[in-house]
C-alpha cells in the first residue's frame, strides 16, 4: 500500500438541545432532561462520522445522501445511516481504517457512556474497538455548548483502498 491508497475525511455536526427529545450520541441513549433537535434521531456524533466517511471517499456529504427534506429519514436511526454510509464507502473501493471523534457538551457528563459509543462504532464500522476513539469534552462554560444550548461533534476518519489492503 502506498500513501495514494490512504484518504482522510473530517466531519462536523451540531444540534440544539431541546425539551421533549431523547439524547442519543454514538447510538447510546443518555439520560438527560433534554435531547438534540433534528430531522432524524439527531445523533451528532454519528452524523459527524458519517460526514467524514463520505468526505474521505469523495462522495459528498451526509445531506446529499440522507437529506433532511426527505420524509424517509424523519426520525431515522443514525446507526442505520452510518452502516449505509460504510456500505457506500466499501462500494467506492475503500475500507475503514480508524475513527477519532470528539463530542463537546457541557452537560451531561458523557465519559461514562463512551465505552458504549465505541462498541457501537466498532460494530457499525466493521472495525476493532481499538480503532475507534471517542473523546468527551466540555467547553468550559463558553459558547453555546458551554451555555448548554447545543452539542457539537467532530470526527476524523482514515480510509484506505480495499484492493491495496488485499495485496499486502
Swiss-Prot record:
Keyword terms, alphabetized: Isoprene biosynthesis, Lyase, Metal-binding
Involved pathway(s): Isoprenoid biosynthesis; isopentenyl diphosphate biosynthesis via DXP pathway; isopentenyl diphosphate from 1-deoxy-D-xylulose 5-phosphate: step 4/6
Binding positions for a divalent metal cation per the UniProt entry: 13, 15, 47
UniProt-listed Enzyme Commission number(s): 4.6.1.12
Top-level EC class: lyase
A GO BP annotation: terpenoid biosynthetic process
Binding site residues for 4-CDP-2-C-methyl-D-erythritol 2-phosphate: 13-15, 39-40, 61-63, 66-70, 144, 147
Cofactor needs: a divalent metal cation
Gene Ontology molecular functions: 2-C-methyl-D-erythritol 2,4-cyclodiphosphate synthase activity; metal ion binding
Catalytic activity, as annotated: 4-CDP-2-C-methyl-D-erythritol 2-phosphate = 2-C-methyl-D-erythritol 2,4-cyclic diphosphate + CMP
Cofactor annotation remark: Binds 1 divalent metal cation per subunit.
Site residues, Transition state stabilizer: 39, 138
Family of this protein: Belongs to the IspF family.
UniProt protein name: 2-C-methyl-D-erythritol 2,4-cyclodiphosphate synthase
Organism whose genome encodes this protein: Ralstonia pickettii (strain 12J)
Gene: ispF
Amino acid at each position: 500500500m502506498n500513501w495514494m491508497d490512504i484518504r482522510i475525511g473530517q466531519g462536523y455536526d451540531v444540534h440544539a438541545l431541546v425539551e421533549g427529545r431523547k439524547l442519543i450520541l454514538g447510538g447510546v441513549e443518555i439520560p438527560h432532561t433534554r435531547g438534540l433537535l433534528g430531522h432524524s434521531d439527531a445523533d451528532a456524533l454519528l452524523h459527524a462520522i458519517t460526514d467524514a466517511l463520505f468526505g474521505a471517499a469523495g462522495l459528498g456529504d451526509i445531506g446529499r445522501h440522507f437529506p433532511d427534506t426527505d420524509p424517509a429519514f424523519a426520525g431515522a436511526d443514525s446507526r442505520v445511516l452510518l452502516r449505509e454510509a460504510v456500505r457506500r464507502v466499501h462500494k467506492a473501493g475503500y475500507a475503514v481504517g480508524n475513527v477519532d471523534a470528539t463530542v463537546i457538551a457541557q452537560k451531561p457528563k458523557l465519559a461514562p457512556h463512551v465505552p458504549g459509543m465505541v462498541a457501537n462504532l466498532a460494530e457499525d464500522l466493521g472495525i476493532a474497538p481499538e480503532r475507534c476513539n471517542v473523546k468527551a469534552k466540555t467547553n468550559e462554560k463558553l459558547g453555546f455548548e458551554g451555555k448548554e444550548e447545543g452539542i457539537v461533534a467532530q470526527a476524523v476518519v482514515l480510509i484506505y483502498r480495499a484492493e491495496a489492503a488485499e495485496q499486502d
